[in-house]
From Swiss-Prot:
Residues 1-19 are virion surface. This is Envelope small membrane protein. It comes from Feline coronavirus (strain FIPV WSU-79/1146). The gene is E. GO terms for cellular component: host cell Golgi membrane; membrane. InterPro entries: E_protein_aCoV, E_protein_CoV.
């Protein structure tokens, strides 16, 4: 069954529809790529925030604990013999 010739403006064998769908597909892919990049940026911001809020204070506390608990090494010349 063919489409009636009276309703055909340009006989392009579906090229306009094909181009329209390709452009729509390209626009959707571009929007998806932008959304994916924004999700990656959000993950990086959350990682940096977690590092700043959790990791660095814990590291400073651990370094302070290490320096507080550090003892001098045994030196036999300074030892007292009883």
């Amino acid at each position: 069954m063919t489409f009636p010739r009276a309703f055909t403006i340009i006989d392009d064998h579906g090229m306009v529809v094909s181009v329209f769908f390709w452009l729509l597909l390209i626009i959707i892919l571009i929007l998806f790529s932008i959304a994916l990049l924004n999700v990656i940026k959000l993950c990086m911001v959350c990682c940096n925030l977690g590092k700043t809020i959790i990791v660095l204070p814990a590291r400073h506390a651990y370094d302070a604990y290490k320096t507080f608990m550090q003892t001098k090494a045994y030196n036999p010349d300074e030892a007292f013999l009883v």
